[in-house]
């Protein structure tokens, strides 16, 4: 079974040429983790150590490589580092950074190419006139490959140039698109700004409506909250009353228990008195028993002393009996006395036995007295314990009674305070409810007013919209009238130029008639002196209206009305102003008065434009009549 490698070599040939580079293809399996210090070595077959490599290259991995994935890679062994042609077999070995062998390739050799392998046969058609004659060319493969490589490089350069041109076109297209996008963004922003303004207005109206709705909802919520609070207060009041009733029942139960405990305490006191009397009796009896015990102990001591004396006397008698036994043989004559003494001894022994029995009885009495004393001491201790427990229970009962009475007093005080606070809270709630009812009424009135104002605002908004529509329509009409006036002004200007040319021709004709001009020359200085002497009249004539001047850059109505006015007689001072040839000869150089008249005429022109449709109609009606009258009057009027 073949060993499974963590790296697999692919497309390994059996023979390579040392004059060209060698490509080593391999696959990194998921079991192997690639590191930057992994390398691939070219080893001779039969190698024993990783240091016996002929040459090596660092193993590479693509930038998108991730651990735990399978990836195909390729490295190049340059021709300068490859071994020469020989029969020695080589193999690729993949070594990781730790020096472990990850894979070995199949064996291959390096051999020089044969001469026939370097030649390539090409078939070319003949360029002559004879058809069917072909040429066979035999060239080296390296030359063929070199020519193909040059063609490929040339194609690559052309493709790169085309790519650069395409990139430039793309950049220009991007710039144009960016400019178009900027213009569109500008228009879009303007439209969005307008839309935002309209949305802002709509939002403001909606916010107003929402505020009104919120206020109304707050008022309704406040009313509901007040009703809920009122219900909660009523429920709390009922709960407090129920609690007060329960506390009263608890107080009754506690008072009854206190009375029962007082009776139990009286009973305990009586029992304590009885136990104290019994204790006194027991103490007296104990004292008597102690006295009796002391007496019996004294008797016992005396009896023991007697017993010791009797024992000593008995010992003496025994010794004497022994002496008598020793001397019984010699003292036979004293036998009777000995028998008497023996009888006396027997009596003494009987007395001793009786004393011993009395001693045993006294000891038994002492034991019984001791047991009784122990029982009495135990009874006394139990009585003391019971008395102590009774005292503790009495103290606890007194404390509980005091606590119950204190709790009863506190409960009554709290109940009174809670009752007062509840009454005060009820009164405050009543006042609050009244205030809130008043506030609700006021807010309802305010809400009605707000609704009325909102309806008025909606109506005013509709009116404003209608006014805006009317203003836009009137603005369109005024624009049209302005265009008509401009066309009419151009026509009047053209007509005035024609009149000026005619007046110049007429003035030349009149100046040629010297005979008729002598009288007019004599009268003209007088008239000019009269103008100098009376400038107010001249100013009045100029300020009387826009009909008595020849300014061409003024209101069109003044130019139209100028020829329509009949020329006054030469005796009037206004004739001097009208018949002056200076404005006609130099119409583009008006005096200060003409400037003032032109400014006034411009103001009147603005007033005429703001006048609307009526002024335009009047101007349109006056134009044909003025033209006809002007032509007739110019034909009849003199030059001066």
UniProtKB/Swiss-Prot annotation:
Keyword Hydrolase tagged: no
Polar residues bias: start-end ranges: 576-589
Primary residence: cytoplasm
Pfam families tied to this protein: CALCOCO1, SKICH
UniProt feature coiled coil, ranges: 141-212, 246-346, 424-510
Biological process, per Gene Ontology: positive regulation of transcription by RNA polymerase II
Protein name (record): Calcium-binding and coiled-coil domain-containing protein 1
Role: May function as a coactivator for aryl hydrocarbon and nuclear receptors.
The keyword Glycosyltransferase belongs to this UniProt entry's keyword annotation: no
Organism: Danio rerio (Zebrafish)
Gene from which the chain derives: calcoco1
Family: Belongs to the CALCOCO family.
InterPro entries cross-referenced by the UniProt entry: CALCOCO1-like (IPR012852), SKICH (IPR041611), UBA_autophagy_assoc_protein (IPR051002)
Keywords: Coiled coil, Cytoplasm, Nucleus
GO cellular component, one term: cytoplasm
Localization terms from the record: Cytoplasm; Nucleus
Organism ancestry: Eukaryota, Metazoa, Chordata, Craniata, Vertebrata
Chain segments carrying region Disordered: 262-288, 519-640
GO molecular function: transcription coactivator activity
Biased composition (Basic and acidic residues): 278-288
